[in-house]
């Protein structure tokens, strides 16, 4: 209903226009992620709101589309979870209490595509982007997270942004992950690796990824 990956590949909603790209487009190799023993296309995430895509009733999603996710997410703002995690990634480590983590290879997630971090994503650079949101203690800190994210700040007191080909997560409790919007299991220990140029898609000749 939000078609994040189609948005990243700039595939039009029009069947006729998409058919034209399928016939006249060009091949583009895209990285994918390996999550322990399985794989995912563009996002692996856990924490607040990440179970909304598979917990929201399908009938509601069919009727309301992206709005269904927004409404379901709003109901949960007052009860943000907290996870104490250890994270290792290329050239860095992090340990602390967080409420949301996303490993991404997309310019659009949950229908959102206005942050500078996502705007500059390269789908076949061998790297995924990581956004880790530290748990706010009050409403002002939560507002600062949103403000700095929209400004494109890479890191700060509220969240961490990093690019890496490898991520390792350790938590004292089982974590419910979502992979591409579907339930991905609840391991305490997770290793994510980027698999370079693993899938080929047909995209429009004018896609900005082809200009780099």
Regions found by a protein language model. Name each.
Residues 1-67:
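Small-residue-rich beta-alpha loop regions that form the catalytic core of phosphotransfer
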Residues 25-27, 78-80, 94, 114, ...:
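Short solvent-exposed loop/turn micro-motifs enriched in small/polar/acidic residues
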Residues 89-90, 95, 120-125, 132-212:
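ATP/nucleoside-binding phosphotransfer catalytic cores, i.e., glycine-rich phosphate-binding loops
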Residues 38-45, 50-51, 94-105, 109-111, ...:
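Short hydrophobic-aromatic micro-motifs
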Residues 13-16, 66-71, 148-150, 173-174:
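Short Pro/Gly-enriched beta-strand edge/turn motifs at strand-loop
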Residues 78-127:
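Oxyanion-binding "anion nests"
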Residues 63-84:
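Histidine-centered catalytic micro-motifs used for acid/base chemistry in nuclease
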Residues 60-67, 108-109, 119-137:
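Gly/Ser/Thr-rich active-site loops/lids in small-molecule metabolic enzymes
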């Amino acid at each position: 209903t939000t078609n994040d990956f189609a948005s990243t590949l700039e595939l039009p909603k029009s069947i006729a226009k998409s058919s034209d790209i399928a016939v006249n487009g060009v091949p583009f190799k895209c990285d994918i992620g390996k999550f322990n023993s399985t794989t995912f296309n563009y996002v692996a995430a856990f924490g607040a709101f990440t179970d909304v895509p598979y917990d929201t009733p399908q009938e509601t999603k069919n009727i309301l589309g992206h709005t269904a996710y927004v409404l379901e997410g709003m109901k949960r703002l007052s009860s943000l979870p907290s996870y104490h995690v250890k994270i290792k990634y290329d050239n860095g480590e992090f340990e602390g209490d967080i409420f949301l983590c996303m490993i991404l290879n997309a310019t659009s997630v949950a229908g959102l595509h206005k942050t500078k971090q996502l705007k500059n994503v390269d789908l076949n650079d061998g790297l995924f982007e990581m956004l880790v949101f530290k748990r706010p203690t009050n409403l002002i800190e939560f507002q600062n997270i949103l403000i700095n994210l929209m400004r494109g700040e890479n890191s700060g007191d509220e969240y961490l942004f990093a690019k890496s080909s490898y991520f390792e997560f350790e938590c004292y409790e089982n974590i419910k992950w979502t992979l591409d919007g579907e339930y991905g299991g609840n391991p305490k220990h997770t290793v994510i690796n980027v698999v370079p140029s693993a899938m080929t898609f047909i995209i429009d000749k004018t896609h900005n990824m082809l200009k780099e």
